[in-house]
Swiss-Prot record:
Family: Belongs to the Mediator complex subunit 15 family.
Gene: mdt-15
Record function comment: Component of the Mediator complex, a coactivator involved in regulated gene transcription of nearly all RNA polymerase II-dependent genes. Mediator functions as a bridge to convey information from gene-specific regulatory proteins to the basal RNA polymerase II transcription machinery. Mediator is recruited to promoters by direct interactions with regulatory proteins and serves as a scaffold for the assembly of a functional preinitiation complex with RNA polymerase II and the general transcription factors.
Molecular functions per Gene Ontology: nuclear receptor binding; transcription coactivator activity
Protein name, as recorded: Mediator of RNA polymerase II transcription subunit 15
Amino acid sequence: MSEEDWPSPKFREHVIQRLEPELARNRQNAPNLPVPGDARQVEEYVFAKCMSKDEYMRTIAKVINAINCNSKSAAVPSVLQPSQFHSPPCTTAALLGNTPAGGTPGYRAPVPPDPQPTSAQARNPPVTVATTQASTTPSAPNPPGGLPAPSASATAAVAAAVASFPSPDTSIRPGGQITPGSQAPGGGPTPAPNVPFPNGSSQMNGGPAMGQPPPQMGAPNMGGPPNGYGGYGMMNGPPGSGAPMGGNPYNQQIKKDMDQARPWDPSAHMYQQQPQWGAMPPQQPHGYPGRPMNGQGATPTGPSSVLESLINQPQQYPGHHNQMGPPGDRNVAAQRAAAQQQQQQQQQQQQQRPGMVPNQGMMSSEDQTVYSAKLRNMRGSCDSLRTRARQCRHEGNHEAAHKLEVMLSVLEGKRVVSLEYLNHLEMWIARKQDFLNIAPMSQNQNHMGMNDPMMNGEHAMLGNGQVPNPYGGHPGYGHQQYMGPPPPHMQMHQPPMWHQQQHQQQQRMMPQDHMMMQGGGGPVHGMYRGDMGHDPMTSPVNNHRHAPYPNPAAMRNNMRMPNGPGPIGRDRNSMSGSSMSGPSSGAPSMNPMGTPNQKMGTPGSMGGMSGLDDLNYDDFLPNPTPIDALQPTLHVGQNSMNAGPPVQRSNLNETARKELQILDARFEIDPNHQRHDANHIIVVCKIRNQQFPPLRLVVPTTYPAGNVTVDRAVIDLDAYLYDDLQNSVYERLSRPGLSSITDYLNAWEEQVNQYQNQTSGGLDVAFNVGNDFFYDNLNL
């Protein structure tokens, strides 16, 4: 069927015809799990909810799947437990007395799902409550008065009826009218309009939610007015039998729990105002209205919440574990169910926020433990995901923003997903650590001297959970004012590791970190000195250390002061050897912005050995980390962190400058050239009027003599959405035949134009891998 046929009445009528047999099967096999309304009402609700054909078809499929799950889980063959009771969906013939006592009807005629009158709305309980209680209530109690044990289906119906425990003063007349007694346990009288049903039978006869037999069977408390119990005689028993009277505390506890679990879906209150759903409340299977909870009226939660629950959480209804159990003692069953309900509630409160759908009950206890542990481990990525989602939303990339927000809601516990989805999300976060680390890096730019425009743009977008340095960066704010360990919010936003294996390094360096915080120092022990001189061993600034590595840009200059102007080892790996520099001398100086400037030193108690791990660890990485890639425009202005000489900025020779000036009309050249090593300079180029990541050319100082190459940073923050483009660009630029700056820039622009023609959105393909998996496993 083509796309144009979707909104047509013919297309929708076909869907209604497909839904009708599923709903009829649900009414017969799952009386305790009703779907409100008939097939047309369900289809109209879905049609009003969905905005496209794909969404419409997915939602219809979810409804059918949910109905099938309910029907299969609740259907119990009547031959398993022969009884004088009928199965809950009693037929019209049984209601008229044509079925002999003790027989089981072999034919179930469906009752037309005629809507109830509006006057019966006050008697309807929240259907979600009755639905959920049907799956959590234990086996039914023994029927009083020597009645035989009910069948399996009747037992399930009786268990569900515990949730509707009314006042014993409320009697039910044969004509279907509820007579209000003295007072309902909820505090208000029960409304009692006389509303006959379309099939002519009373409200009580064959009511599946009550689980009683037809009137002709002669049960003492089943048939109507005697003793004032009506269909609830099985629950309360006759007077003098010792059965509990009035409100049921266990039932009240369940109602309280279910009411707390309901507000998770705000659309429930929105859809109940629609005419087809708000004006006529949904009827129970076979036209039996629901009973008020303990005499109370229905809650404002509209019937759409039931269908919304079926659409969103089809596995919300497990296989009714307790419905097949033998009848037990009433008090023991209630106590056991109350303890089980309390335990489940505590687990849900630990694993998710209040108001969430209890999805995780489907997991085993071992899986729940793994699920919670993974959530705790990934909780630190929430701020980064939130920042990136906000940035994508601001840039108009709503698709990427929505995906990031979905991941964020999973990590924050707002969505409970499968363990398989969580594993995939964990792998994705580990693979995208390069751009997820932008959040803490942007936050620390104030006291690390980073003034790059891109970094400032990121910092401007950090709105949640970002706080300034509590130790201050102004004159007079020495560390004598703060003697304790770093505050929790600073521990959450640690300085980034500048490696792709950040989280593994943090875990491996934890013992060393703990030792340094207590008695020693570390490579960064002098990083936040005040305007007074301190002993490196006794300064409380040692407690400020969060991570095993300091800012490499700050250490790159400090390491050169005591050892002369030459670098230690390779210049690109100077961050690794910076912690081996000698002790500093003299009092620290303050720059005009008030930021303490102190040369780095090694504490005497460590004997200069604390930096060995720092020195050698970077050598195990696949590629050495170019320090200039991590040090954007450090010395623009007077906000430097260090008292040493400024970073050496080498200018290009005249030939390279003239060539770049010719290309200035098409390319934007960063004027702040960074030194790559002793003989090469990095030139950062961008294509004008384009949002693609910049290109980093490594130009020799003797240009045009020497070879121009391309540098690809290990942590490429600008290219996190363009993995495919970057791979194709670097593959093209690695081919032979390119020698000059112009050759490289022309080839780069050509490759970008080809990529732009092939893709419309520009979103990274690697970012889109498994998008369907993300959505299919989220139980939307």
